[in-house]
């Protein structure tokens, strides 16, 4: 007979074994040609495999390999000569919104041992002119969001990745159209959506002006500033003020708005190096003109990505993550698009 303490020890071991066996795991590998002539032919196949013992419901995040519909910064590419310039899109995407909506098309479900392969055309996202013809290492982003099966809450996991190497020569960049309008214009927008966009542009203009006025008159630490940009320093404050000043220099009534995107989980996207056009997607039309994650706020978010405005990144999505970023890494918070949006929306209001 086992003693009580022995039985408890064995029971604990069993629980530990169950916990270990249920641990999620992913591996990610790339395949493609060993050499490529012209970057328009630079394609890789990314294969994601569930290496754990539990089924994973993974979000089709546009910044992960599970989505190839947007030319996002999904890969780290480097050579002895350096790295190519990223010339693709920055997308406003909220994982919490996607989990709450819970549409089947928003997820990829992988049972243990199951794999999925997604093809990516990298020439649409990277310009190799500066780094030149060379042998390049390509490594995919390892971060994935999934729905925790125990809590139904958003969780994240990093996959074990394998890189791919290829030689690139020939034409090193894909040409892309640029637009810098002098008045508001539309592409593929119904009259109803044009009316909605006039209101959204006006809201964004008000947000930008109010934010600039606030920052100009508050040159010390405030609750609102600290919440979204972290501990106050004059240098970081100057950076944020400059970004809102640049937004005012390019009024939202002068942009081209493109309504041809049909992705329901995405709010909007832009090509940061191609100033002038903001592409609006499904989630944009489902939100409100003002308030949290609003249409006006989305235009603040997207315009901040433009290189000539602020050149922001997408280090964190959503209010909770943006607040955490401000606290833990203010240097990234002042370069994160959602932090500018939430500061401008100021909802709930802070002084």
UniProtKB/Swiss-Prot annotation:
Regulation acting on activity, per entry: Inhibited by chelating agents such as imidazole, alpha,alpha'-bipyridine, and 1,10-phenanthroline.
Signal sequence annotation: 1-22
- Co-factor note (free text): Binds 1 zinc ion per subunit.
Which reaction equations make up its catalytic activity?
Preferential cleavage in proteins: -Xaa-|-Lys- (in which Xaa may be Pro)
MF annotations from Gene Ontology:
metal ion binding; metalloendopeptidase activity
Q: Which cysteines are joined by disulfide bonds?
A: 189-259, 261-281
UniProt-listed GO biological process terms = proteolysis
Q: Which GO terms describe its cellular component?
A: extracellular region
pH curve summary? Optimum pH is 7-7.5. Active from pH 5.25 to pH 9.
Concerning InterPro entries, the annotation shows:
Fungal_M35_metalloproteases (IPR050414), Lys_MEP (IPR029463), M35_peptidyl-Lys (IPR034115), MetalloPept_cat_dom_sf (IPR024079)
Q: E.C. number, please?
A: 3.4.24.20
Propeptide feature: residues: 23-183
Keyword Hydrolase (UniProt):
yes
Q: Which residues form the active site?
A: 302
Q: If you read the UniProt record, what top EC class would you report for this enzyme, in one word? A: hydrolase
Entry-linked PANTHER family: NEUTRAL PROTEASE 2-RELATED, PTHR37016
Write out the similarity annotation: Belongs to the peptidase M35 family.
Query: What's the protein here called?
Result: Peptidyl-Lys metalloendopeptidase
Which organism is this protein's natural source?
Armillaria mellea
User: What phylogenetic lineage does the species belong to?
Assistant: Eukaryota, Fungi, Dikarya, Basidiomycota, Agaricomycotina
